[in-house]
Amino acid sequence: MQREPALDPQKLAAIRAPFDRLGGARIEASVLQPLSLLIDLAGESLRARLFVVQADGAEEMALRPDFTIPVVETHIASHAVSGLYRYEGAAFLLAEPGSDQPSEFLQIGAERFGVSDDPLDDDAALAALAFEAASAGGRQDLELRLGDPALFAGFVAALGVAPPTAARLVRAFRSQRALHQELTPDRQPAAASEGSDLSDILAKMSEKDAARLLGEVWRLSGVQPVGGRTAEDIIHRLALRAEAARAPNLTAGQSDLLRRFLQLSDRPGRVLDAIAGLAKEAGAELDLLLDTWAKRLAKLEARLAPQWGGVHLATAFVRPFGYYDGMVFDVESRALGPDLPVAAGGRYDALVSRLGGQPGAVGCMVRPGRAILGLRP
């Protein structure tokens, strides 16, 4: 396993300092995480890059690819309504084939939980924290890229897309290939054979009977559901997916508007203006969503005024981990390019709820090995 080179202690301390000033509890997160939980929460595409271990007769575990899920678990176990946590340690993610990137690397980060009086300010504060910490490594070419899956979901809904089709689009948003297929007006429906035999059987039953059967299958096989989901939750999700698969395709006009929406990448104010123009063209109502984003940008600009010229909003930008559902961001170096972010983060309210906690969560992390100028990333 390729590791990062040794990091300069003084520069590492400078990167750590903004997190120390933030305060909160310093925690040690579990290195091993249940593989099924990671895949369920972060997405199937992550599987090929995980380091998986398994003892005889035990469930498959994976080395943590980042800290978010283990920190969420720590917070929920504390039974606290709100919390602020800092962490520092190694994360593990197999490098892409042909890449010279390390598969073991240091992360420093923070996660904030709980219902806030001003969640927009929390978003701005964590993004500014990430930028400040990333800048402490000496790079002068950093930029901040913003995105929000909720912007896409809101635009889809405003176009009057049928709810099952809209749900299908939102799921596809994290995959360029899947989204391209969805935006094709003559898209062919998914073949029925794509599901498993069991899921096909369950889909033909009432939700109540299907949940009872699935529970019996679990009992007989000794299987434990992951992520705190009940049989009823899973059956309801299968029913929604089956409904989405049968949903009508987009019209040519809807597809064209969505393609133009996804091409937007510019200074944040210009992107919001362009979205407003598309909404007006479609006769859609997006004022509330755009007003919320305008307020978020004002708070960000107040915290990042000297760096504001390097802030961009991209409507197609999405974090690789599938649990982010609000504003997301990458701090990028022009020298390293967008595929090697120096820092990253975002809002993931629904993840905490899915694991049994109270909604409200935003966090960020920095990769010191990329932040330190002159160090091979």
Tell what function each PLM region has.
Residues 4-34, 66-79, 83-139, 195-377:
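Positively charged, Gly/Ser-enriched RNA/tRNA-binding surfaces
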Residues 107-181:
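Internal, well-ordered domain-core segments that constitute the primary functional module
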Residues 47-57, 160-194:
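Acidic, His- and aromatic-enriched active-site or binding-groove loops in soluble protein domains
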Residues 78, 85-87, 142, 146-151, ...:
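RNA-interacting cores
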Residues 29-48, 147-157, 317-326:
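Beta-rich nucleic-acid/ligand-interaction surfaces
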Residues 39, 98-100, 155-159, 376:
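Short acidic, glycine/serine/threonine-rich loops at helix termini
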Residues 41-60, 68-80:
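An N-terminal, globular interaction/scaffold subdomain
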